[in-house]
Amino acid sequence: AKENRQETIVLIDGAQAVSHMNVDVQELGCDLYAFSGHKLYAPTGIGALWGKRELLEKLPPWMGGGEMIKEVTFEKTVYNDIPFKYEAGTPNIGGAVGLAAAIRYVSGLGLDNIAAHEQKLTDMAVEGLKAMPRLTVLAPDVPHSAVVSVLAEGVHHYDLGTLLDQMGIAVRTGHHCCQPLMCAL
């Protein structure tokens, strides 16, 4: 597929992957790879963008300010070298420190250990949910991430989510940022 891309720029949103698997952008063959830090247990408002140097040098910044400018005249603006070209204004220093700490934390735990623990919890949840009447676990025997989807007969998903929350069980209901898919299902 890489050979047939021509001028297409491939951006991968890796927010869901970074806390669960090692990511090799060279192996993926993407042009840009982004993730938000809160998916890696960092504070909100921080993330990372990796990009191929030649692409980052060509792309214009989307914001203006501070360190990103090398020269400004009435006739032209010359942007700073990367990465400063994309660093408009005062950086989110606290967020960057938090992201670095989160990366150290996850690295210290080890992605394999995290995956094994998630799998153990997922298996326990699936077995417990399968035993509940009027509850259907979708694809219970298919290997998957720690996300477990269920259908509850006769109960609206928001009501079920509220009841579980009152019992101290964290769940997510709604469209999960993919409303077209949910509508199709």
Give the residues covered by each predicted segment.
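Pyridoxal 5′-phosphate
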Residues: 1-185
